[in-house]
Amino acid sequence: MRELDVVGVRVEMPSNQPIVLLREVDGERYLPIWIGAVEATAIAFAQQGVTPERPMTHDLFKDVLEAVGAKLEQVRITEMRDSTYYAELVFAGGIRVSSRPSDSIALALRTGTRIFAAEPLLDEVGIVIAEGSEGDEEDEVEKFREFLDHVSPEDFAS
């Protein structure tokens, strides 16, 4: 398993499809995942520290975990089958629950949980975005935009 950071959420044009981009912490590969609009909003809110007036589903789930004393230890993006990504939530005691990556990422951002991807998955669909100058956040966003201009979901079909 390789640890990932969330780079951000953007909308791919012209399809108007949200995408979340993750980056290896100690590597150069990126993992793009097409997601739904609601999940994109949940991820963006968590990244920006936005607290809605009423809890969203992922906020509620975080509150339930805290109320029952459950500890989310890891989020793992495990595989892609038939152009669909799969993930699991790993709780204390080794309990694993299947989850969509978008929901897992939204929950991880709210709970401060680390996100991982399986090495074979990154080998299969991870991409390297050409480096320009030393990357700061603006460079990272620009590379992401350039990537979106040249990619489609079909590029990741097995």
Spans of model-derived segments:
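Divalent-cation
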Residues: 1-158
